[in-house]
């Protein structure tokens, strides 16, 4: 498990450094991808964590998804390389952005719901 954290950190660094040489669109999408690496690591840890640790991991996921969502909303569809090259229309670029934002909103909503459910489960004494 320790190696997965190291690998995730290395991938995060590569993605961030790689994003520095690309367009604004590329930097923004690279940041979203870098956060996704962190989210994958947190989701992996959820599988074997105890209840208290899960709450912390859900907080981490909520923070990651919130950051991704904030960044995704800043995407300018006109800076999409596919739009600039003419392979998609502006409407398709806008749809792509909206789909990405909607997906991130669903992930955030699910993490919040799962976290709240776990908090209620922990707070509710077991029925005897």
Task: Locate each region found by the language model.
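Intrinsically disordered and other compositionally biased segments
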Residues: 6-7, 45, 49, 98-101
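Intrinsically disordered, glycine/charged-rich N-terminal periplasmic/extracytoplasmic linker segments
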Residues: 54-128
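Immediate post-signal-peptide N-terminus of mature secreted/exported proteins
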Residues: 20-63
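Generic alpha-helix initiation/capping and coil-helix boundary signal
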Residues: 1-6, 32-35, 65, 86, ...
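Intrinsic-disorder/low-complexity regions
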Residues: 2, 23, 29, 49, ...
């Amino acid at each position: 498990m320790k190696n997965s954290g190291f690998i995730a950190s290395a991938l995060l660094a590569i993605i961030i450094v790689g994003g520095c040489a690309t367009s604004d669109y590329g930097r923004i999408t690279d940041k979203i991808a870098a956060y996704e690496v962190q989210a994958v690591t947190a989701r992996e840890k959820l599988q074997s964590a105890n209840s208290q640790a899960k709450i912390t991991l859900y907080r981490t996921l909520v923070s990651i998804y919130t950051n991704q969502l904030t960044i995704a909303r800043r995407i300018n569809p006109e800076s999409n390389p596919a739009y600039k090259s003419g392979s998609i229309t502006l409407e398709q670029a806008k749809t792509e952005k909206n789909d990405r934002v909607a997906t991130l909103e669903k992930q955030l909503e699910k993490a919040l719901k799962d976290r709240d459910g776990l908090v209620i489960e922990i707070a509710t004494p077991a029925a005897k």
